[in-house]
């Protein structure tokens, strides 16, 4: 595992920097900079107070926190969110409360997502008349579960 230098600024001094909970973790926890209340089924775009400058050839992916999803039904609408290397604005996270009955309250400073930094491979798309065959072929949604439990 290598450390990639990511420049960071915050919208105010009290905004916590992203933190890794354990050595070897892929995702660094990011927090909300405001109090948020999500009614059942409600979504909101939540500011984190952090801005980053990624090196060329890298992307930051914003992933849901598994504990927030498991305990409260809160996840990210466009998971994973993509922060391109050229973006310099504040990172925001669009959360949704999938619980049908319970309202969720998040307080300023609560961890709401994980930021994963990855190297990017760009594709060179090549138009062809037909694609080469494969074992899977054109089997789509649910095709690998046919005949199984």
Residue positions per predicted region:
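DUTPase catalytic domain/fold
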Residues: 1-149
């Amino acid at each position: 595992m290598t450390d990639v230098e990511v420049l960071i600024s915050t919208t105010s001094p009290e905004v916590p920097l992203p933190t890794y909970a354990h050595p070897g973790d892929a995702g660094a926890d990011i927090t909300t900079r405001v109090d948020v209340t999500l009614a059942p089924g409600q979504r909101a775009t939540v500011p984190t107070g952090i801005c980053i400058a990624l090196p060329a050839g890298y992307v930051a992916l914003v992933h849901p926190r598994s504990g927030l999803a498991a305990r409260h039904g809160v996840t990210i609408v466009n998971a994973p969110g993509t922060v391109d290397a050229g973006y310099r604005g504040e990172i925001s996270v669009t959360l949704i409360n999938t619980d049908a009955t319970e309202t969720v309250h998040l307080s300023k400073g609560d961890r709401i997502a994980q930021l994963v930094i990855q190297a990017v491979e760009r594709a060179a798309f090549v138009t062809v008349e037909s694609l080469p065959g494969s074992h899977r072929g054109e089997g789509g949604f649910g095709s690998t579960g046919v005949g199984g439990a």
